[in-house]
């Protein structure tokens, strides 16, 4: 695989920087005036400390970028953009393919800091796994009064159809995406749990490939942990979950189709795992078993990694008009003849109101204090907390429990009196559907803005894979960046982008694999997207296309709810 073509003056990096003298004025053109705006004055900057010194993990990146002038910064940014376009990396919004902007400056996390995050994410996934097993089983946490029963019965993602479906190896959460932010003290906090079909891991892998091409020398001087083995961990988890044909189970990826926002990711993961990418019309059920139609005839399916929301999964159990799912799929799962990943009904674990009780779950199931704290949250369904929200509505961020993509959020300090009055009415009319949080100062990372670098808010979505024996956390995750000045909305649909996330390996590490740039560029599989039908060779029903666009639950979008 060839590397991205850069202008000749950019092809050498380290030696060139040492041999050529640069004036301080040139450095000022890149970092000059960095973080002088009051907008980010209270935020924790991940590259610079409060005295303006470069933090340890970023010293190499700073040394590479600081001597550059505006033309060099622009050249690298253009090379980066070309690479993304050439690789066909897009997301779908309202049926239109759009590029997903990748910023030039990676986000760097030290080995020790990542170790703490890894432990906290693993703890959280284990507690949520125990909670889901309990909720769809004996419901001891409800009988003991630890959380209120009406919290579950009022959750639209609690599905009684899932009762009695017991995962063969006890795993319901095969993949989790735990959204994190960093507060003004530099502490990571959990913003949200995504336990259904968390999206975005394809961009993690593609970001790495692209940055490795544009900054090959940086990978030679940094011990960056690899991300290209995600698909192998996911495949192991899926195969381990099989109840039938355990020695050689047939695994498929079930997609709503090309109109879905995350179709690029569905096809990429299927290719990397070496399994079939199927739509609902490719599968059928007979005698409580699931079969796939192939050119060689019927083939029994043992594990379905579905990227379809519960509501569209089985028209006999959920939406009767669904053309995306497979009739009889739920009964086949209940009979133990197929495993659906992630499990039906997992949404009762990532409801935004349920999120507020996760620390309580950890103490109940694990007898442990949370290693990663939640963001402080007021629950509008509780009378006293609802009144506090209404009293402080000008100072809070109001979030719909079922919101996604950043839509429906009301930022109290920025809202008009009319908007706040409308929000107050919604809260009074349906308090179960709203939570409120303080305006959080997200951390910032230098981001290309025109011909210079400026701070922009970021979040992080690490991905955890549970294979039944261990919870493995992909080193890094998807860093999303709010490209609009002052905005805290990182969603791609509202002007957000992403960054490559580097987790540095410890100096004496035997279990943490790292790659140099050459190996990264050569080893990552090609990821050109599957050809999209133009409408003539492959007829598509109109309801299917409409539902494929509609069936984009929060975890299927590259977005923060």
Swiss-Prot record:
Disulfide bonds: none annotated. Residues 1-22, 522-561 are annotated as: Disordered. This is Uncharacterized protein ML0605. Pfam families: CP_ATPgrasp_1. To Synechocystis PCC 6803 sll0335 and to M.tuberculosis Rv2567. PANTHER family: BLR5612 PROTEIN, SLL1039 PROTEIN. Residues 541-561 have a biased composition (Low complexity). Gene3D superfamilies: 3.30.1490.270, 3.40.50.11290. Signal peptide: none annotated. Transmembrane segments: none annotated. It comes from Mycobacterium leprae (strain TN). Residues 1-11 have a biased composition (Polar residues). SUPFAM superfamilies: Glutathione synthetase ATP-binding domain-like.
């Amino acid at each position: 695989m060839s590397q991205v073509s850069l202008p000749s003056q950019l092809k050498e990096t380290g030696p060139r920087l040492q041999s050529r003298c640069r004036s301080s004025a040139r450095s000022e053109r890149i970092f000059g005036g960095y973080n002088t705006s009051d907008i980010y004055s209270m935020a924790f900057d991940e590259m610079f400390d409060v005295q303006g010194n470069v933090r340890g993990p970023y010293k190499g990146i700073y040394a590479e970028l600081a001597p550059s002038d505006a033309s060099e910064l622009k050249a690298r940014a253009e090379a980066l953009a070309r690479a993304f376009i050439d690789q066909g990396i897009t997301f779908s919004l309202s049926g239109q393919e759009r590029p997903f902007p990748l910023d030039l400056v990676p986000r760097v996390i030290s080995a020790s800091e990542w170790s703490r995050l890894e432990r906290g994410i693993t703890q959280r996934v284990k507690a949520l796994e125990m909670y889901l097993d309990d909720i769809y089983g004996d419901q001891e946490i409800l009988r003991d009064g630890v959380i209120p029963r009406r919290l579950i019965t009022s959750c639209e993602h609690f599905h009684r159809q899932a009762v009695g479906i017991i995962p063969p190896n006890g795993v319901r959460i095969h993949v989790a995406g735990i959204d994190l932010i960093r507060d003004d003290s530099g502490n990571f906090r959990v913003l949200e749990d995504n336990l259904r079909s968390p999206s975005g891991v394809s961009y993690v892998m593609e970001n790495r490939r692209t940055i490795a091409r544009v900054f090959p020398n940086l990978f030679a001087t940094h011990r960056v942990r690899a991300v290209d083995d995600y698909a192998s961990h996911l495949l192991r988890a899926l195969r381990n979950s099989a109840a039938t044909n355990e020695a050689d189970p047939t695994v498929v990826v079930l997609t709503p189709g090309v109109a879905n926002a995350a179709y690029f990711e569905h096809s990429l993961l299927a290719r990397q795992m070496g399994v079939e990418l199927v739509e609902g019309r490719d599968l059928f059920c007979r005698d409580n078993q699931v079969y796939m139609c192939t050119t060689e005839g019927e083939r029994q399916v043992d594990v379905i990694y579905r990227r379809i929301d519960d509501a569209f999964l089985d028209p006999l159990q959920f939406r009767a008009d669904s053309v995306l799912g497979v009739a009889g799929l739920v009964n086949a799962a209940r009979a133990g003849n197929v495993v659906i990943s992630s499990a039906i009904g997992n949404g009762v674990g990532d409801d935004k109101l349920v999120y507020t009780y996760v620390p309580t779950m950890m103490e109940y199931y694990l007898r442990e204090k949370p290693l990663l704290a939640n963001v402080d949250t007021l629950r509008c369904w509780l009378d006293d907390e609802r009144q506090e929200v209404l009293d402080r509505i000008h100072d809070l961020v109001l979030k719909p429990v079922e919101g996604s993509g950043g839509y429906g959020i009301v930022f109290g300090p920025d809202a008009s009196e009319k908007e706040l009055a409308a929000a107050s009415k919604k809260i009074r009319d349906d308090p179960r559907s709203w939570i409120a949080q303080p305006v959080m100062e997200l951390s910032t990372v230098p981001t290309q803005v025109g011909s210079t670098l400026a701070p922009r808010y970021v979040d992080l979505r690490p991905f955890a894979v549970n294979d039944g024996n261990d919870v493995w956390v992909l080193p890094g995750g998807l860093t999303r960046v709010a490209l609009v000045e002052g905005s805290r909305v990182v969603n791609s649909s509202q002007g957000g982008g992403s960054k490559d996330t580097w987790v540095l390996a410890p100096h004496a590490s035997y279990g943490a694999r790292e790659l140099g740039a050459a190996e990264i560029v050569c080893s990552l599989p090609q990821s050109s997207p599957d050809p999209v039908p133009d409408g003539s060779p492959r007829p598509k029903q109109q309801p299917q296309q409409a539902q494929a666009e509609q069936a984009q639950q929060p975890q299927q979008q590259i977005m923060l709810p």
